[in-house]
Amino acid sequence: MDVFKPEKLFGIIGHPLGHTMSPLLHNWGFAEHKIPAVYMAWPTEPEKVESFMQTFRNLPISGASVTIPHKLSVMDYIDQLTERAESVGAVNTLYWDGDKIVGDNTDAAGVSEPLRPYSDQIKKALLIGAGGAARAAITGLQSLGIKEIFITNRTKSKADDLAAEFKISALDWDARGDQHLDLIVNSTSLGMSGKFEEINPMIMENQDKNTIIFDLVYNPLETVLIRKAKSKGCTVIHGIEMFVHQGLEQFRLWTGIKLDEKKARELLLEKL
């Protein structure tokens, strides 16, 4: 009997990690291309990030995905940032270049690529949330040439800080639903499977069929925001689209191989 013997180890760090489908995507990719590697989930509490990075440096780990809430904190423990990670100001991908740990970011492409077909009709966009995913979302939106971008967050000071850094405008949390918008992007965990699942991050009274809703939450597929947007006739983009595009780019960075986008999407949709 053949025994699978992985030669390379990859994984994802975050907290919590109960909802992650990254192992499914990457392990499928390894199997599809007969790569002797395995990808695991490593739940890592914030106070243990430094310890994890020491482990990454000392054990034969070939690469890692980084998710909430570690996309900023891991930057203290890497040797080199890519240009796009510097632009975003956050890291979601780790890999080795010789003996240096490199931090990269594939999230901005995960936002921009699903929106590209609609970019000409997006003049005014609102981003909900001010964490690591928000930074990537702003970079992705700006790469599409969207000029009028607003950001809102329950903690206003965080929105103010990002607005100043990226030269966009901050809105009060209670004012987020006051105007009609061409695009709304949710980068918070509100609506995610678990304790926040039934919390809608957006007030939808002033939105209509001309509004595009992009919820970066991908589990569940039909979030409370997506359901409300559909009831208003809005165009909706599910979080699975960001997940697919950022994940395919991670796989390419680690292996040099571009996975089949359609097959990857079908694989993930089967699990949602």
UniProtKB/Swiss-Prot annotation:
<feature type="binding site">
    <location>
        <begin position="153"/>
        <end position="158"/>
    </location>
    <ligand>
        <name>NADP(+)</name>
    </ligand>
</feature>
<feature type="binding site">
    <location>
        <begin position="20"/>
        <end position="22"/>
    </location>
    <ligand>
        <name>shikimate</name>
    </ligand>
</feature>
<comment type="subunit">
    <text>Homodimer.</text>
</comment>
<keyword id="KW-0521">NADP</keyword>
<dbReference type="GO" id="GO:0050661">
    <property type="term" value="F:NADP binding"/>
</dbReference>
<keyword id="KW-0560">Oxidoreductase</keyword>
<dbReference type="GO" id="GO:0004764">
    <property type="term" value="F:shikimate 3-dehydrogenase (NADP+) activity"/>
</dbReference>
<feature type="binding site">
    <location>
        <position position="92"/>
    </location>
    <ligand>
        <name>shikimate</name>
    </ligand>
</feature>
<comment type="function">
    <text>Involved in the biosynthesis of the chorismate, which leads to the biosynthesis of aromatic amino acids. Catalyzes the reversible NADPH linked reduction of 3-dehydroshikimate (DHSA) to yield shikimate (SA).</text>
</comment>
<dbReference type="Pfam" id="PF18317">
    <property type="entry name" value="SDH_C"/>
</dbReference>
<dbReference type="InterPro" id="IPR022893">
    <property type="entry name" value="Shikimate_DH_fam"/>
</dbReference>
<keyword id="KW-0057">Aromatic amino acid biosynthesis</keyword>
<dbReference type="InterPro" id="IPR036291">
    <property type="entry name" value="NAD(P)-bd_dom_sf"/>
</dbReference>
<dbReference type="GO" id="GO:0009073">
    <property type="term" value="P:aromatic amino acid family biosynthetic process"/>
</dbReference>
<dbReference type="InterPro" id="IPR013708">
    <property type="entry name" value="Shikimate_DH-bd_N"/>
</dbReference>
<dbReference type="InterPro" id="IPR006151">
    <property type="entry name" value="Shikm_DH/Glu-tRNA_Rdtase"/>
</dbReference>
<dbReference type="InterPro" id="IPR041121">
    <property type="entry name" value="SDH_C"/>
</dbReference>
<dbReference type="InterPro" id="IPR046346">
    <property type="entry name" value="Aminoacid_DH-like_N_sf"/>
</dbReference>
<dbReference type="GO" id="GO:0009423">
    <property type="term" value="P:chorismate biosynthetic process"/>
</dbReference>
<protein>
    <recommendedName>
        <fullName>Shikimate dehydrogenase (NADP(+))</fullName>
        <ecNumber>1.1.1.25</ecNumber>
    </recommendedName>
</protein>
<dbReference type="GO" id="GO:0019632">
    <property type="term" value="P:shikimate metabolic process"/>
</dbReference>
<feature type="binding site">
    <location>
        <begin position="129"/>
        <end position="133"/>
    </location>
    <ligand>
        <name>NADP(+)</name>
    </ligand>
</feature>
<feature type="binding site">
    <location>
        <position position="218"/>
    </location>
    <ligand>
        <name>shikimate</name>
    </ligand>
</feature>
<dbReference type="Pfam" id="PF08501">
    <property type="entry name" value="Shikimate_dh_N"/>
</dbReference>
<feature type="binding site">
    <location>
        <position position="83"/>
    </location>
    <ligand>
        <name>NADP(+)</name>
    </ligand>
</feature>
<feature type="active site" description="Proton acceptor">
    <location>
        <position position="71"/>
    </location>
</feature>
<dbReference type="InterPro" id="IPR011342">
    <property type="entry name" value="Shikimate_DH"/>
</dbReference>
<dbReference type="GO" id="GO:0008652">
    <property type="term" value="P:amino acid biosynthetic process"/>
</dbReference>
<comment type="similarity">
    <text>Belongs to the shikimate dehydrogenase family.</text>
</comment>
<comment type="pathway">
    <text>Metabolic intermediate biosynthesis; chorismate biosynthesis; chorismate from D-erythrose 4-phosphate and phosphoenolpyruvate: step 4/7.</text>
</comment>
<feature type="binding site">
    <location>
        <position position="67"/>
    </location>
    <ligand>
        <name>shikimate</name>
    </ligand>
</feature>
<feature type="binding site">
    <location>
        <position position="216"/>
    </location>
    <ligand>
        <name>NADP(+)</name>
    </ligand>
</feature>
<keyword id="KW-0028">Amino-acid biosynthesis</keyword>
<feature type="binding site">
    <location>
        <position position="239"/>
    </location>
    <ligand>
        <name>NADP(+)</name>
    </ligand>
</feature>
<dbReference type="Pfam" id="PF01488">
    <property type="entry name" value="Shikimate_DH"/>
</dbReference>
<feature type="binding site">
    <location>
        <position position="107"/>
    </location>
    <ligand>
        <name>shikimate</name>
    </ligand>
</feature>
